[in-house]
Structure formats: structure tokens, C-alpha cells
Regions:
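Alpha-helical transmembrane segments and their immediate juxtamembrane cytosolic regions
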Residues: 1-319
Length: 319
């Protein structure tokens, strides 16, 4: 993907913790409840990661192995997915599962102890400091701190914004988003790299959120006119099986690379980057076919073991 477009799109990631904050219970929630509700994300991270790790060890091409298997296993366990050359490439996207659990837990702990402002201030400091010296903590703790403010923004937005966003607000937000992406570069949460000027990334992310919320409001209002039923169906499918897709889309791409290699084609990381417009659909289409054809129990068994256990248990009780 062209660098400028990629850097612009990186700011979209902020919408997800914003949604978590938007959906956060108005009266708060206990730490125990958060752990019980969201610990399945950690289980899915390690479960999917271990499957992908085994695939990388036994099936990946040697050109994609830049470091020993033991070092990669350690980085996988510590969620050091920022170390691109020292962790299996098919594990990297899974960092978000672990991060989402950590940020919601951290937010709840700090909010319940009335220390949220301190945590947000520390997160802003990390963003600014990252422009001077790279910061990367195990288990995505640093990313959780830097995104606390985004989660709180989502909660406050729901609480205080009761009218629809206007067109001029959306255009202004888009302009700010574009400008900051051009000035600051991309914002990569996985690596803890927030661009040339860390504080600008926060402004760019807020602008991206406002624009995306406006788009969502327009789509909701004009649903029959804008969203074709076929497009809505595809998006719904990907949404329902998002963890399965997140966990296996690179592995599916790896299988395709293996097939191409068997017929004499040479595929490298440079090739994948240069021909992104071919790489992306070649992973997207097979993944869509998989989520269409595979039964739900199998998809859960391959990606969300706890949900699979609950499904099996409920069927046993019914019988």
C-alpha cells in the first residue's frame, strides 16, 4: 500500500477503544467483572498464537524466518509483536486481542481508584517521549496507557454529545486528519510509534474518530439508500467472525504462498509489499469463503476455545 495512504489509515485504529469507552457501563463496572467478561481475549491470543506459531515453525518458508524459534516463542508469550524481525509474522495481528483486555482492565482499575487522570497523563507523556526514545513494554502495557484517553473520550462522547455531527464538523475533522497524517506520519500502536510528534497523533486520532462517527451516522440515517444488502451481508460476516479472520488471514496467505512456491513462483516479503493490491484480495477472498463454508462450532473451536466450550455445554444441557 502506498506509504501516504497507509499512514493516513493508521489513525483509524483509535475508533476501537473509542467504541469500548462508548459502550462502557454508565455506572462503572468491577475489576472482577471485567476480567470475567474479557479474559477470553487473552485465551484467544495464546490459543491462536500457538497454532500460528506451530504453522510458522513447520511450514513457513525459510526466507520468512529471521530469528530462532526460541526467541520467537519468548516474544510471542510476552506479546512483543513490535519486534517484527523476531516474532512470526502471522502472530503480529493478534496483539490487539491482548491489548484490548489490558486497556479495559487498566481503565477500570484506575477509574475505580480515581486515578484515571494520572493514567491518562502518563499515557500522553509516553506519546510525547516516544518521539525522542522508543518505548515498548511487555503485554502492551505502554499502548494501554497511551489509549486510556481514547477510551475515556468514547465514554464522555456518549454522555455529553446528544446531537448528530454536522457536515462542517466532519469536513474539519477530515482536514485535520489528513494534515496530521502528512505532517506527523503514521501512528503505529503495535510498535509504540506515534509519528514524528507524538502529541499530534492524538489530535489526528480524535479527528479520525469524529469523521468516522459522522460517516456512521450518515449511513444509519440513509441505510436503504447507501448500503446495498450484499455489502452489508459481507461486512456483517467479517464482523461476526472477526477474531477468526484476525487470527488466520496471514496464515491463509502463507498457504497460498506455499502453493505458489510449489509451482515455481518466488514470493518474498518485498514482493508482498510491492504488490499489495494483489496480496490483500488474495487473503480476503479465501477468508470470506472460509467463514461462509465452515460451520460456526468449528470456527469457534479454531479461534475462541472458551466460547466453543460454552456452546458445547449449552447443547449438552439442552439434550
Amino acid at each position: 500500500c502506498p506509504t501516504a495512504v497507509f499512514e493516513f489509515l493508521t489513525y483509524i485504529i483509535a475508533i476501537f477503544p473509542f467504541i469500548s469507552g462508548y459502550l462502557y457501563p454508565k455506572d462503572g463496572v468491577s475489576v472482577k467483572k471485567i476480567i470475567k467478561k474479557r479474559s477470553n481475549l487473552i485465551l484467544s491470543y495464546y490459543f491462536l498464537g500457538f497454532i500460528n506459531y506451530l504453522f510458522w515453525v513447520f511450514a513457513a518458508q525459510e526466507s520468512f524466518k529471521n530469528v530462532g524459534t526460541g526467541e520467537c516463542l519468548k516474544n510471542f508469550i510476552l506479546v512483543r509483536t513490535d519486534l517484527f524481525s523476531a516474532v512470526p509474522i502471522n502472530i503480529i495481528p493478534l496483539w490487539y486481542l491482548f491489548f484490548l483486555f489490558v486497556v479495559e482492565l487498566l481503565y477500570t482499575v484506575l477509574r475505580n481508584r480515581r486515578l484515571l487522570a494520572v493514567g491518562i497523563a502518563f499515557g500522553i507523556f509516553l506519546r510525547v517521549y516516544s518521539s525522542i526514545h522508543h518505548v515498548a513494554m511487555p503485554f502492551k502495557i505502554d499502548v494501554a496507557f497511551t489509549s486510556l484517553i481514547t477510551l475515556e473520550f468514547g465514554r464522555l462522547f456518549k454522555e455529553r454529545v446528544h446531537s448528530k455531527l454536522r457536515l462542517w464538523q466532519a469536513i474539519t475533522a477530515l482536514g485535520i486528519w489528513l494534515s496530521i497524517a502528512w505532517i506527523n506520519g503514521g501512528s503505529n500502536w503495535n510498535t509504540g510509534d506515534y509519528g514524528k510528534f507524538g502529541i499530534l497523533s492524538l489530535v489526528g486520532e480524535f479527528a479520525a474518530i469524529i469523521f468516522i462517527v459522522w460517516v456512521a451516522q450518515v449511513v444509519e440515517k440513509n441505510n436503504p439508500k447507501i448500503v446495498w444488502s450484499q455489502i452489508a451481508s459481507v461486512l456483517r460476516r467479517f464482523s461476526e467472525d472477526s477474531i477468526f479472520v484476525l487470527g488466520y488471514h496471514i496464515t491463509v496467505g502463507g498457504i497460498i504462498i506455499g502453493i505458489l512456491s510449489m509451482v515455481g513462483m518466488v514470493v518474498t516479503e518485498e514482493t508482498l509489499r510491492a504488490y499489495w493490491y494483489i496480496t490483500f484480495p488474495s487473503m480476503l477472498v479465501p477468508m470470506y469463503l472460509l467463514i461462509l463454508l465452515l460451520p460456526k462450532p468449528l470456527k469457534l473451536a479454531l479461534s475462541q476455545p472458551y466460547q466453543f466450550y460454552q456452546l458445547v455445554s449449552s447443547k449438552r444441557r439442552q439434550n
